[in-house]
A protein has these predicted regions:
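Short, conserved phosphate-binding/catalytic loop or strand-edge motifs used
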Residues: 285-292
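Soluble non-cytosolic domains of exported or imported proteins
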Residues: 260-264, 303, 366-373
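N-terminal accessory segment at the very beginning of proteins
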Residues: 1-250, 255-258, 262-271, 282-285, ...
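Active-site-adjacent "subsite" loops/lids of carbohydrate-active enzymes
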Residues: 326-373
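Short secondary-structure boundary/capping segments
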Residues: 38, 270, 297-302, 335-341
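Second-shell loop/turn segments in exported
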Residues: 255, 297, 362-365
Length: 373
């Protein structure tokens, strides 16, 4: 295996895998790997431009004890950006350090250069690629050692009461009442972003951590080291973007119900708040105010004059939040036009994926630029 300094990035190839480690923001590194001939070029969640941060790369030979007991000389390498340093041994196993102290290391149990010698016969790779039939994508698993006494925070919003995610198995997918944000904040002083837009899971076990992407062409993660959680988050938002401050009324009183069936119900509730002298900031009109799914308009039978309703609510100082679903019923006036323009989701075999929920429905393909308009 040969390490190279590729324009300020540490790169190497090993057993059909290309790996690239580079500076990406302050005190941070981005790590990518692929089994393909080249990287995709996608930055995914790393949306913000970053100023070039020159990294210090060291490539050197070191003596290593081989499996037969003999000593051989092999290359190892390191890349440093501010407070974080990544070291790579001759078998491509990565370790990360903050100010010289180990904070994260890949979980590798094989004969090819294990840093930890226990259970080498398990033959567990730190980065495991399993090809999917019929294409160029893989199921990817990336494993790290579990830090003793380490606590893990973040990862989004899940239906559990575990503030510390150590010991949790977390699905990496969006669901109703589940928001997956694959960013982990460690008590050891680092932040880790799994930068792979794929359904999968994250397991923070007591024995090791494991990140899984069920279908991907490459591995991509970002890691930063800092002295406090605040500093970690500052570096994270510098590369992923910072949310604007909420307007004051969005932090006020919201009124919502499953569901208001008519225009008059909504107005009656808002008028009652005004009578009681209670400041109402938002009122939510939830699902099935429409004709059929995909028409994206109010049912005139129950909502005869939406504009007049909104005007009255605005006059009372109440903003209106309207639930809009991406589902399109085959009976919808928009179904055929959307189908003809290729703006509906399809399966990998090209067929429409339908399901029965108050109608035979498909979903708008929000990843299509035209559909988003």
């Amino acid at each position: 295996m040969k390490f190279v300094n590729d324009g300020g990035a540490l790169a190497f190839s090993h057993r059909g895998e290309q790996v690239r480690i580079e500076s990406w923001g302050r005190d941070a590194l981005r790590v990518r790997a692929t089994r393909g001939r080249e990287f995709s070029g996608h930055d995914w969640a790393l949306t913000e431009p970053v100023e070039p941060a020159p990294a210090q790369i060291v490539i050197e030979e070191t003596e290593f004890r081989d499996g037969d007991g003999s000593f051989v000389r092999r290359e190892r390498a390191s890349i440093t950006n501010g407070r974080i340093r990544a070291e790579v041994n001759h078998a491509g196993v990565l370790s990360f350090f903050r100010d010289g102290s180990l904070i994260l290391r890949e979980h590798f149990r094989d004969y090819d250069g294990a840093i930890s010698r226990e259970s080498r016969c398990l033959k567990l790779a730190a980065r495991e690629w399993k090809g999917l039939p019929g294409g160029s994508e893989y199921q990817l698993k990336v494993r790290f050692e579990s830090g003793k006494g380490e606590k893990i925070f973040g990862m989004g919003q899940y239906q559990d009461d575990c503030m510390d995610k150590k010991g949790c198995l977390l699905e990496l997918a969006q669901r109703n009442s589940q928001i997956s944000i694959p960013f982990a904040l460690s008590s050891l002083g680092y932040g880790f972003l799994w930068n792979n837009p794929a359904v999968g899971q994250a397991v923070f076990g007591s024995n090791y951590y494991e990140w899984t992407a069920l279908s991907t062409r490459e591995m991509d993660y970002w890691i930063t080291a800092a002295g406090s959680p605040r500093d970690v988050l500052e570096r994270y938002t510098a590369v992923t973007g910072r949310a604007e401050m909420f307007p004051e009324d969005l932090m006020g009183l919201w009124q919502c119900k499953l569901r208001y069936r008519t225009q008059e119900e909504v107005l009656a509730v808002a008028r009652k708040y005004r009578e009681e002298g209670i400041k109402l900031d938002q009122i939510v009109i939830d699902f099935f105010h429409w004709t059929v799914q995909g028409d994206w308009r109010f049912d005139e039978t129950y909502w005869p004059d939406p504009k007049a309703m909104v005007d009255e609510l605005h006059a009372m100082g109440v903003k209106v939040v309207v639930s809009v679903w991406p589902t399109v019923d085959r009976r919808s006036e928009n179904f055929v036009p959307l189908l003809d323009r290729g703006l509906l989701m399809r399966t990998e075999r090209g067929a429409l994926q339908t399901y029965d929920y108050e109608g035979d429905c498909v979903e708008l393909d929000a990843f299509h630029p035209e559909a988003r308009q």
